[in-house]
């Protein structure tokens, strides 16, 4: 049965397979072999184990019970194993995000876009192929939304810099107003080293709020797994 097929998949073997591919992506990126990087990314995003781990990720995280506009949840093993076969680039068309508003401490509300389970899994899949590049080329002193990094690491770096005998006298705090709301789609497509057609579809998928469909001509949805990669990286 489908449920038995799901239970029979060796997750450790899947993780080893993906980890080795990611290590090869890092090696190719460091050697400047961008064609090789692309082919390895393609291999990862089309692999059974990569697609399996993407389904595992979205069905075990905190949002596993939160559905998108289609109200579909992958709550059974049978649904999960069937989902693996749906994660294909050919013919893929993401659905609009379901927008909800989250109350903030200051009384205002923060919009959050909730993708469907399938779109979340596709994002998780492509993120596996993108993360090795982001971690290789990203700023070593960037800590926000980075793997294995936290605000404690940022604090430690500030302490290291500011405790020196010859230390900076000023600390500049800056904030880009409405950064994710207005970031250029053209810039993202030119600078994010991933499948451009898939990225374009995510950026242009729109969102549904109060039963009405809205287009997305600029900015990235707060809820899109790849937004943390939006810091400058080296394009192909």
Model-derived features with residue positions:
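Phosphate/adenylate-binding "loop-and-lid" substructures adjacent to NTP/NAD/dNTP-binding pockets
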Residues: 37-109
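Catalytic palm subdomain of template-directed nucleic-acid polymerases
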Residues: 177-193
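Reverse-transcriptase-like RNA-dependent polymerase core
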Residues: 55-58, 84-108, 121-130, 156-165, ...
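Short, conserved non-catalytic motifs in the polymerase core
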Residues: 62-75, 94-121, 137-150, 172-173, ...
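Non-catalytic, well-ordered alpha-helical scaffold segments
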Residues: 19, 23, 35-38, 42, ...
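Charged boundary/loop elements
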Residues: 3-63, 128-144
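Single conserved hydrophobic/aromatic residue that forms the stacking wall/gate
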Residues: 227-236
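Active-site-proximal segment of RNA-dependent polymerases
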Residues: 5, 123, 130-182
């Amino acid at each position: 049965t489908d449920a038995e097929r799901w239970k029979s998949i060796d997750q450790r073997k899947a993780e080893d397979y993906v980890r080795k591919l990611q290590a090869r992506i890092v090696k190719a990126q460091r050697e400047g072999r961008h064609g090789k990087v692309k082919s390895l990314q393609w291999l990862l995003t089309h692999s059974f184990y990569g697609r399996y781990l993407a389904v595992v990720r979205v069905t075990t995280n905190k949002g596993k019970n939160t559905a998108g506009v289609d109200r579909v949840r992958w709550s059974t093993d049978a649904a999960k194993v069937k989902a693996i076969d749906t994660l294909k680039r050919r013919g893929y068309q993401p659905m609009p995000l379901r927008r909800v508003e989250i109350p903030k401490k200051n009384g205002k509300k923060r919009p959050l876009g909730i993708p469907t389970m399938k779109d979340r899994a596709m994002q998780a899949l492509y993120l596996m192929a993108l993360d090795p590049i982001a971690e290789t080329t990203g700023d070593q002193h960037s800590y926000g939304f980075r793997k294995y990094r936290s605000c404690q690491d940022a604090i430690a770096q500030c302490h290291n810099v500011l405790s020196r005998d010859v230390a900076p006298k000023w600390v500049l705090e800056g904030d880009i107003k409405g950064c994710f709301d207005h970031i250029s789609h053209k810039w993202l497509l030119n600078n994010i080293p991933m499948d451009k057609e898939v990225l374009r579809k995510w950026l242009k998928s729109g969102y549904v709020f109060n039963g009405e469909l809205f287009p997305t001509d600029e900015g990235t949805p707060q809820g899109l797994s790849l937004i943390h990669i939006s810091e400058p990286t080296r394009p192909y």
